[in-house]
Amino acid sequence: MKNITARNQPAMHKISRMSYNEAFCSRSVEKQLEEYIAFFKEDFAFVLKKLEERFNGPVVAEGNQLLPSLVFPHLQPGHKAIWMIPAERFQRHHYSKRSWIKDILDCTDDPAAAFDNWMTRDARFAEYVEQEAKALNLGVLKVDGSQDLQATIDEIEEYFGPAQG
């Protein structure tokens, strides 16, 4: 975050200076989502630079900055990408179990409302990513907890096919 400026990365600059209360309570979920997506679009250039510096060839990467519309132009012919999209119920359940979430929520005026806004925003973000990926004919795997980890791994391996070597 030290290399961002209000001029070049306005969303990153704005969000990086918000309190948790501002981030999750004082703005509508729609505004949160709009600014969240703008943040990730700005951050994508930094992520891409790091990936290009470290890897020459296929890469496995994760992060909200890797929006399908931003990744797509960088895929070489024959390369594939898949987005694992959490179901809202799955995400709410697992986020509520993370100890650091409580620390963040305790910094807000209304922890229950903040959590609900956060999870609603994230559910809408998941829908946004899923729609982008499908529009570009990129892979999507919905994660809802209905299959175990090995089944998820198997599904991803099947999507990518046999390793090239």
Language model features with spans:
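A solvent-exposed, charged loop/short amphipathic helix patch at secondary-structure junctions
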Residues: 16-31, 98-115
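Short, hinge-like loop/turn segments at secondary-structure boundaries
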Residues: 6-17, 78-79, 101, 159-160
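ATP-dependent NMP and nucleoside kinases share a basic, alpha-helical "lid"
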Residues: 52-55, 59-108
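Conserved nucleotide-sensing/catalytic segment adjacent to the nucleotide-binding pocket
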Residues: 2-58
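Alpha-helix-centered segments that form part of catalytic cores
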Residues: 31-47, 113-131
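Short catalytic-loop micro-motif centered on adjacent basic/acidic residues
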Residues: 34-35, 59-61, 140-143
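NTP-dependent small-molecule kinase module
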Residues: 124-165
